[in-house]
Amino acid sequence: MNADKRIDGWLHDLDRLLDQTESLVKRGRASYDTDPALPLAFEALCNRVGDLAKKLTAADAVTFVDTRWSQAARTRDFVVHQYHRVDSDVLWETVHTSIPKLRPLIAEIRRHRRGAVS
């Protein structure tokens, strides 16, 4: 599989994760605070989004140069390696506010990639 197909697949995976993120966030902060499964799901989302951000920046550092990609990767590293220090308020903010900001970046990258192919 060539690099372009891998990138397309990773962007598709990221779209799916962002949809799942949106669905979980819609449950609300009160559910997040009372359902012990939701913070764990948020940690898993941070892990997966950050892992994809790492793959995308490694595959094409010029296209995936926006600092939000590296922030997602660093968040992943923190959540995975410092899980005992994860602050629930910061985790909520990250999944509620920061991760959704990747969606317009994905749309912009897709427009750019379609233009480059045409």
Give the ranges of each region predicted by the language model:
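Solvent-exposed interaction patches of small proteins and small membrane subunits
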Residues: 1-118
